[in-house]
Amino acid sequence: MFTQVKSTIRHIAPDDLRGRKLIKVVYVVLESQYQSALSQAVREINANHPSVAIEISGYLIEELRNSENYEELKRDIASANIFIASLIFIEDLAQKLVAAVEPHRDNFDVAVVFPSMPEVMRLNKMGSFSLAQLGQSKSVIANFMKKRKEKSGAGFQDGMLKLLRTLPQVLKFLPIEKAQDARNFMLSFQYWLGGSAENLENFLLMLADKYVLKGEDKQKLAAADYQAPVVYPDMGIWHPLAPNMFEDVREYLNWYAVRRDISRNLKDPLAPCVGLVLQRTHLVTGDDAHYVAIVQELESLGAKVLPVFAGGLDFSKPVDMQLLGGKISAVRNAHLT
């Protein structure tokens, strides 16, 4: 359904460089959740950053079945400073992407590929650290990659999250220079999983600082110009009117019970309760309008709503931990795209 969409609709370039360094970014992703947040991040940089401007082009992987989009990708790749890809698990399209990107990989300043098929992951390039080298290494990361490379996207992403949490122990097995680049890769993954426009803005500025800018351009961009990732729960409970995400069902139900915008009937412990299963990326990137509409409609019909989310594709954990303790009358998978 994406093949008739022209990828040029996602192209953003600064109106005026004002003497700033122009950095060209190309990204290829599975679904459209990141489009809005990335676009907002780039527009914020172009409007307000004193030393850096971004030109960005984006593609959904299915769009590469269209020959016009594929040729456009190859043209964009040829002049890119930064390449980003995520969740590329469709085999024929993964091979097509590698064929377009691999000839230009050495010319990138940096390439960051998040959970994808092994041949796509090998396109990663961050300083002296390259995932393509891990097959010849005896490091902890190498063993992790070998065990995970045949697994599904959900298992791979869950494994990457575990690796992220044990990063200090992993880095001690690498030489200092490679350890720093490995840290930057995992830091990039934190920014990406955070998904908000703020996180993605800081992600792009971090890559610019560490890998793109040289000499005077680098001196203009101090590390203070970007912030550490804002980390959101891997799984939990969300509501469009709540002040934050919840990691405990009791905290969520306590908040629900003191809401002033709903009737007493909804606060009744015996009120019907509908559990929703949501995908985390839609929430952190702000691509949540369909979730908001579902919650509002169910509440208007007299049902209490308990929307749980998870970061991977395995929703059994949040269902077991949150929904089964919430006196649920019905469960609905709300992953509608």
Q: Model regions: which residues?
A:
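An N-terminal assembly and electron-transfer interface module characteristic of large anaerobic redox
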Residues: 1-337
